[in-house]
């Protein structure tokens, strides 16, 4: 189905994906608040705007700022707080305790589950995250083609990255896996990745279309076609009907939400409060300061589609299954 171009077949694929989602989740869609709290990174990924060698303005939020933003997101109605950072050596090597303290405070103050996306961390750090009760560990392989991985994630170890998420799962954390499209992969690579996501037991699986980043070696690539992304979302839904599958606001902003939900996604990610001094990842500024990535905006679109934002209790009930 990924390579078929008949519009009628594609619409039937999306229709089946929506029915599969409805069977498990009724008309409820989950909402994730996004706090990208440090854009410093030791890595030099060829696809990333925040790669180490890119001469850009960066920020690192204080623990107090992170907690305040998380509280504001919780009050706005999100179901989870997603804490994301680059592989910032300040936190990775010097003060990982600060990350743990922030997670503990957010859980206590908001009562919401937390997802941490810190890049590759040590087994000991994963154990400490798990002991704290951190629900999710997000770490994307981007591709499961090792040769392509080496071109995307320069001088990084495929097995080390895979080990981290498997170890997190072994320690009782839920795992999110993700891939990029439009970076030189084949349809066979995509199919392999979808299968691998199931093999590693990922409870949340995502795909994102590549957006060329200024100052990166892949700046000259063409922006990936979101139709392929939506087809992959639909196939993932049919393969893993009870999985969490995001529709990210980080690719096409709020205007791209409806198409991804129509393809079978059941999570809206990258909800960012305006005027908090935060960036997105693939589209670092799109819709952020204008308030286009808020619960209010996303909820209005869902209701227009006959869907409803899930409550915090409904999300916790899902996690307990």
What are the residue ranges of the model-derived segments?
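Glycine-rich, proline-tolerant flexible connector loops at the mouths of alpha/beta enzymes
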Residues: 32-35, 82-95, 147-149, 209-221, ...
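Conserved strand-turn element in the central/C-terminal portion of the radical SAM core barrel
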Residues: 88-91, 117, 164-189, 207-223, ...
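Catalytic cores of alpha/beta
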Residues: 122-131, 184-198, 252-263
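Auxiliary Fe-S-binding modules of radical SAM enzymes
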Residues: 1-6, 67, 200-321
């Amino acid at each position: 189905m990924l390579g078929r171009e008949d519009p009628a077949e594609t619409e039937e694929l999306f229709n089946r994906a929506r029915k599969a989602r409805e069977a498990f989740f009724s008309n409820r869609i989950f909402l994730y608040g996004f706090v990208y709290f440090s854009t410093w990174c030791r890595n030099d990924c060829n696809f990333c705007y925040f790669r180490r060698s890119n001469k850009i303005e960066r920020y690192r939020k204080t623990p107090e700022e992170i907690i305040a933003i998380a509280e504001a997101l919780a009050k706005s109605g999100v179901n989870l707080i997603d804490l994301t950072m680059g592989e910032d050596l300040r936190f990775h090597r010097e003060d990982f305790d600060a990350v743990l303290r922030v997670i503990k405070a957010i859980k206590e103050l908001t009562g919401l589950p937390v997802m941490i996306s810190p890049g590759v961390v040590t087994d000991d750090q994963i154990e400490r995250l798990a002991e704290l009760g951190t629900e999710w560990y997000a770490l994307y392989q981007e591709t499961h083609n090792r040769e392509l991985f080496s071109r995307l994630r320069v001088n990084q170890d495929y097995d080390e990255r895979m080990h981290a998420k498997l170890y997190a799962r072994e320690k009782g954390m839920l795992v999110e896996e993700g891939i990029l499209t439009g970076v030189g992969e084949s349809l066979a690579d995509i199919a392999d990745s979808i299968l691998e996501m199931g093999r590693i037991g990922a409870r949340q699986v995502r795909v994102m279309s590549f957006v060329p980043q200024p100052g990166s070696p892949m700046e000259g690539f063409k922006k990936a076609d979101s139709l392929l992304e939506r087809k992959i979302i639909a196939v993932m839904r049919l393969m893993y009907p009870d999985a969490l599958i995001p529709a990210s606001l980080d690719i096409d902003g709020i205007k791209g939400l409806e198409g991804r939900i129509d393809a079978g996604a059941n999570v809206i990610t990258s909800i960012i409060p305006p005027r908090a001094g935060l960036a997105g990842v693939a589209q670092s500024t799109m819709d952020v300061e204008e308030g286009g990535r808020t619960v209010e905006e996303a909820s209005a679109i869902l209701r227009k589609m006959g869907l409803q934002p899930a409550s915090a209790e409904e999300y916790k009930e899902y996690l307990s299954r």
